[in-house]
A protein has these predicted regions:
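A generic structural signal for tightly packed, nonpolar segments enriched in small/aliphatic residues
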Residues: 51-52, 200-493
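Short amphipathic alpha-helical segment within the helicase RecA-like ATPase core
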Residues: 1-264
Length: 493
């Protein structure tokens, strides 16, 4: 999607749809309606007849009779004193959705000055909302190939200061959109398109376009590193595992890297502890952690942030077969620790364990892993909030602040020592499942056994990685959750 900034007024716009905003304020709304009626007399009847009051996310469409600007959309922002950055994101999303419904290809949005919100932040919010809501995973739909799509987006303002601030965030916004779109596409892709080998090829391709060094460790190398967790989960699949290493060097050579680890289970049947048939098709998204980790490093690189970042992705399928690992097996990980397999559907923590051990070789500044790890997190937090656990207060604080800025909510869960009792084994160091109670916490505690001497945080995106319906700027399907969060963390490191 093409983005441009224009230091012009409303009358100078040339777009299929032009969006302007109004607060829920009688005096301000009356003034705006008067101004619009003066500039566009043909719209006066609609302005008088439509009961538009400026409430948040409400909108009316005015027909101007002007070929270069046939429609003006008036969108409500709600009470002026209640305006937030998230309100602006949602307003941008309303503009893009309404424009798409009109089969518009070009959209201009007015970047108004907002009290208490910087021009850069308000501009970014409008762009985010408009761009993120414009996503559809439709590559396999063979009908309507000629259907018009929104492809050009202009932010216009009469203020030189606002225009300058907006121009300063265009590259960042484009990078964000590219990273989120990549993550969504990877998560939504069917398993016959994205499996370990093709995920690795995708990483190589996007890495080349973003000046990211990509190294693919094959099964032989994985075996030599004694990554027992990744190898055990892979036993049931005819497709070999891969371990993806992506390195972006935007900081100083002496700067320690920020490491992102993403769970890359490209399809999860549950293995021998097989899942119910209902909803199993969604298990193509069990690699959303990997999708977001790859999308995040691409976004960071495209935004040219001055930081060193490494993404690690252990990838395999979890399949049942005569050679699959089974409950009761004991496996040895890269760091020498052993685990009893209680449930083969608790496989994500096994592949992440080896990746967290491998992360130590980079002497990282911090490590954050993302994974669709536990159904328990969905029960606890639903599809709205990501579970956060970790060992470092500063890192968790950075994540929480980024979550507030991006509206990608997180909620911290405790890692109290008493929960360790739930993953004790009689025959190995630990076991891979602690039962139904505190499932999200015990999964994180399992991972804690494999971290090195570095600050670590774990994000359980089991609920937030997939949406069952379209919401404001989150589409149905893979959400791309975590990309904007990680990009914001890197930006403010």
């Amino acid at each position: 999607m093409k983005i441009s900034i224009s230091n012009t007024g409303l009358s100078s716009q040339k777009a299929d749809v032009v969006a302007v905003f109004s607060y829920e304020d009688e005096k301000l709304l009356a003034s705006l309606k008067k101004d619009l009626t003066s500039q566009f007399p043909s719209a006066s009847a609609t302005l008088q007849s439509e009961d538009f009051n400026g409430k948040a996310k409400t909108a009316i469409t005015l027909y101007t009779g002007i070929k270069s600007m046939p429609r003006i959309m008036l969108i409500g922002l709600g009470k002026k004193e209640s305006l937030t950055i998230e309100s602006l994101r949602k307003a941008g999303a309303v503009a893009a959705k309404r424009a798409a419904a009109c089969k518009a290809e070009t959209l201009s949005i007015h970047a108004m000055d907002c009290d208490g919100i910087s021009a850069a932040d308000s501009s970014l919010a409008l762009i985010e909302g408009a761009m993120l809501t414009n996503y559809r995973f439709d590559k396999y739909i063979t009908t309507d190939k000629d259907k018009k799509k929104l492809s050009t987006f202009t932010l216009f303002t009469e203020s030189k200061k606002t225009a300058a601030a907006a121009k300063g965030i265009v590259n960042y916004a484009s990078a964000m959109y590219e990273g989120v779109t990549l993550a969504r596409n990877l998560a939504n892709a069917p398993n016959n398109e994205i499996y370990p080998e093709t995920l690795a090829k995708t990483a190589l391709s996007v890495g080349k376009s973003a000046d990211i060094k990509v190294t693919i460790l094959d099964k032989k190398k994985i075996q030599s590193l004694k990554m027992g967790g990744l190898l055990a989960v892979n036993q049931g699949s005819v497709r070999p595992p891969v371990f993806i290493v992506m390195e972006y060097k935007g900081g100083k050579s002496t700067d320690k890297p920020f490491v992102i680890v993403g769970k890359g289970i490209t399809f999860d049947t549950g293995g021998i502890s097989i899942k119910p048939a209902g909803g199993m098709g969604d298990m193509k998204m069990d690699m959303h952690g990997a999708a977001s980790a790859i999308g995040a490093i691409v976004a960071i690189a495209k935004a040219k942030l001055p930081i060193n970042v490494i993404t690690l992705v252990p990838s395999t399928e979890n399949m049942p077969s005569g050679s699959a690992y089974v409950p009761g097996d004991i496996i040895t990980f890269m760091n020498g620790k052993t685990a009893e397999i209680d449930n083969t559907d608790a496989e994500g923590r096994l592949v992440l364990a080896d990746a967290l051990t491998y992360a130590s070789k980079f002497n990282p500044e911090a490590v954050i892993d993302l994974a669709t790890l536990t159904g328990a997190c969905v029960v606890a937090l639903g599809g709205v909030t990501t579970g956060l656990m970790g060992t470092d207060e500063l890192l968790k604080s950075r994540i929480k602040k980024a979550a507030e800025r991006t509206n990608e909510y997180v909620c911290e869960l405790p890692l109290y020592e008493e929960y360790e009792e739930l993953i004790k084994s009689d025959v190995a160091d630990i076991k891979n499942s602690g039962g139904r109670g505190a499932g999200t916490i015990t999964a994180a505690l399992f991972l804690k056994h494999f971290i090195g001497d570095y600050p670590w945080a774990h994000l359980d995106i089991a609920g937030t990685g997939m949406s069952t319906k379209d919401t404001d700027y989150m589409p149905k399907g893979g959400t791309g959750i975590g990309v904007r969060l990680l990009l914001d963390i890197a930006k403010n490191w």
